[in-house]
């Protein structure tokens, strides 16, 4: 019997903050593995998603949105991570927001061009473009920048052109053994998953009030047989003022955040969960 060839490679998703990288990743994988919000820089660290279909395995890395210094337009936060991640890439997906090409997109493009790795451009959120005719001149404008393997307009939310996107990605995967078992969809640890579930609720409840430096630390994670999960987590903020914002009047905000986080953890792990949240400041 002829053995099927296997294909496997890393696909890096890059772009400015809030262009839809995490939404795209979730839709490709078919499960929510990366939190999504309108707040910039929701993704704080690399999120790895794995999609195995037949003899093809794509390992996606959703990188934090590239942040720029307001004074000189230089890349700052996550810059080293940006370079390190591209070292293992088979393909780079560069996402841009509709036809909004800025100097920051130009800088990102110039950086990823240096890697000599094939680049696929995705024009996201096309559902928000009422006059689709304007897409053609914009695509022609992009074609003059570099010889991209493809320029694909999509709506990550509405999953338009997703099958075409997957087929393009498969065509660039090298012949290789699969790195992960077929059942794997992410390399995220349970600790990380829980901290992200909590952080998502902090973002949703606090919105613009949310301190940008907020971090969630899982202090303990204990499973009592298959009966219950006991979790203690610390929400770290910078100062007392930020602490009061997170807690809310009479503790109302933190109670709601805790309740919904607990429910979402139970849905994720299919087990009754006891969650204790502490808000601490670093001063």
UniProtKB/Swiss-Prot annotation:
Protein's cellular compartments: Cytoplasm; Cell membrane
What membrane topology does the UniProt entry give? Peripheral membrane protein
Identify the keywords attached in UniProt to this record, alphabetized: Cell membrane, Cytoplasm, GTP-binding, Membrane, Nucleotide-binding, Ribosome biogenesis, RNA-binding, rRNA-binding
Question: Per the record, GO CC terms?
Answer: cytosol; plasma membrane
Q: Which InterPro entries does this chain map to?
A: G_ERA_dom, GTP-bd, GTPase_Era-like, KH_dom-like_a/b, KH_dom_type_2, KH_sf_prok-type, P-loop_NTPase, Small_GTP-bd
Q: Which family does it belong to?
A: Belongs to the TRAFAC class TrmE-Era-EngA-EngB-Septin-like GTPase superfamily. Era GTPase family.
Residues binding GTP are: 15-22, 62-66, 124-127
Q: Name one GO biological process term.
A: ribosomal small subunit assembly
Residue ranges annotated for the Era-type G domain, each copy included:
7-175
Residues of the region (G3) are 62-65
Question: Which PROSITE patterns does the record cross-reference, listed alphabetically?
Answer: G_ERA, KH_TYPE_2
**Which stretches of sequence are listed as region G5?**
154-156
Q: Which Gene3D superfamilies match?
A: 3.30.300.20, P-loop containing nucleotide triphosphate hydrolases (3.40.50.300)
Protein name in the entry: GTPase Era
Function summary? An essential GTPase that binds both GDP and GTP, with rapid nucleotide exchange. Plays a role in 16S rRNA processing and 30S ribosomal subunit biogenesis and possibly also in cell cycle regulation and energy metabolism.
Quaternary data? Monomer.
Superkingdom to which the source organism belongs: Bacteria
Q: Which Pfam families match?
A: KH_2, MMR_HSR1
Q: Which organism is it from?
A: Buchnera aphidicola subsp. Acyrthosiphon pisum (strain APS)
Q: Which residues form the KH type-2 domain?
A: 198-283
Q: Where is this region: G4?
A: 124-127
Q: Which GO terms describe its molecular function?
A: GTP binding; GTPase activity; ribosomal small subunit binding; small ribosomal subunit rRNA binding
Specify where the region named G1 lies, as residue ranges.
Answer: 15-22
The segment annotated G2 runs over: 41-45
């Amino acid at each position: 019997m002829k053995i099927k060839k296997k294909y496997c490679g890393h696909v890096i998703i890059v772009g400015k903050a809030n262009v839809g990288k995490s939404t795209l990743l979730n839709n490709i994988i078919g499960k929510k593995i990366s939190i999504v919000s309108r707040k910039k820089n929701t993704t704080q660290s690399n999120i790895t998603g794995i999609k195995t279909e037949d003899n093809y395995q794509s390992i996606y890395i959703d990188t934090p949105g590239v942040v720029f210094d307001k004074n000189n337009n230089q890349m700052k936060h996550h810059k080293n991570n940006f370079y390190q991640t591209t070292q293992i890439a088979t393909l780079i997906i560069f996402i841009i927001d509709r036809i909004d090409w800025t100097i920051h997109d130009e800088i990102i493009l110039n950086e990823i061009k240096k890697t000599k790795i094939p680049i696929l451009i995705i024009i996201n959120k096309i559902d928000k473009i009422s006059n689709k005719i304007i897409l053609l001149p914009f695509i022609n404008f992009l074609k003059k920048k570099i010889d991209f393997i493809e320029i694909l307009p999509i709506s990550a939310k509405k999953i338009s052109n997703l099958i075409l996107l997957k087929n393009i990605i498969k065509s660039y995967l090298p012949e290789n053994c699969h790195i992960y078992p077929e059942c794997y969809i992410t390399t995220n640890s349970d600790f990380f998953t829980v901290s992200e579930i909590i952080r998502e609720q902090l973002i949703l409840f606090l919105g613009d009030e949310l301190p940008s430096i907020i971090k969630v630390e899982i202090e303990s994670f204990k499973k009592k047989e298959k009966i219950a999960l006991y979790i203690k987590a610390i929400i770290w903020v910078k100062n007392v003022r930020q602490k009061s914002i997170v807690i809310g009047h009479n503790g109302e905000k933190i109670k709601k955040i805790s309740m919904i986080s607990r429910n979402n953890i139970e849905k994720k792990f299919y087990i009754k969960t006891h969650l204790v949240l502490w808000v601490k400041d670093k001063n």
